[in-house]
Amino acid sequence: MKLRTFIPVLVVLIFATSTAAQQVTSGGPRRGYTPEPGAKDLKAVLFNWTWHMGMLRGAQEVEAVATLEHQATGVIQVDGQPCRLSKYRVSTNYQAGGQRVQYTCARPNGQQYSNIEVVSGQFAWNEDIVGAEIVPGKGKATPMVAALTERLIRLWAGPQGAPKAAIAGGDKTTVAWENNKAVVTYPIPGVPGAVAKATLSDKYQAERVEVAHNGVTTEFTYGKYDDWNNELNKVEAFYAGTLVEKRNGATIRDLTTTETETGNVYVVVPVPASVRASAQK
């Protein structure tokens, strides 16, 4: 028999703590609660949603997914044009409300384009290198105040972010049943007035999340859920294999998952001082 060596994965990023994100921490029904077969109340739906996603951890079955690494291929929109990806990596810290998206893609004319998009709490910025300006003189961080809402919506409407935000919504989260499918309505953390409606499949995994905010409708569709972790690190935590994002009907991102790391790798990131200063002006 071959012995497998498991190597811990360390991802060092740096995200600021936000009040909204701190509310989206470990939660959900505790062990000792088991929904009755066919139960359709909110408590049962939230339990089944996180259970079928593999997000309940430990003997107490507490929702304790803190971070996510996600890699994909596909096409995203850049300056209104499709850009085919050669690299797409998302590093998420749910407890800090932070997410960094690194990507490189080719425009229709073949020109290469790269960017690093970051959101952390109530701050959004772009980087020319990972962790720009954290070490003085290293890299450039560009504030992106106008992108804050879009990035927070993407974070909390994601396959894992949605159930976390729904749990954090407390009495503002509701459930209805349409065509024998649970539809969970919840507020998007950190975006006042943004309301999400998540339609779950018969396996209690989000197949569609629609977010309405200030006249803009952002729709996320998900499919082909699986454990996309490396073969040496399968943990039966499931993530969408296909992810499509549309804004007012126009496709913004069309992604196919290649790999995830759902074992709570270390993801942390401070907001650069220049970004904080810009937000205070």
Per-region residue spans from a language model:
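Bacterial N-terminal signal peptides
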Residues: 8-16
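Flexible, processing/modification-adjacent segments and terminal tails
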Residues: 24, 28, 36-45, 121-196, ...
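Catalytic loop of the DD-peptidase/beta-lactamase superfamily, centered on the K-T-G motif
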Residues: 107, 116-122, 132, 139-146, ...
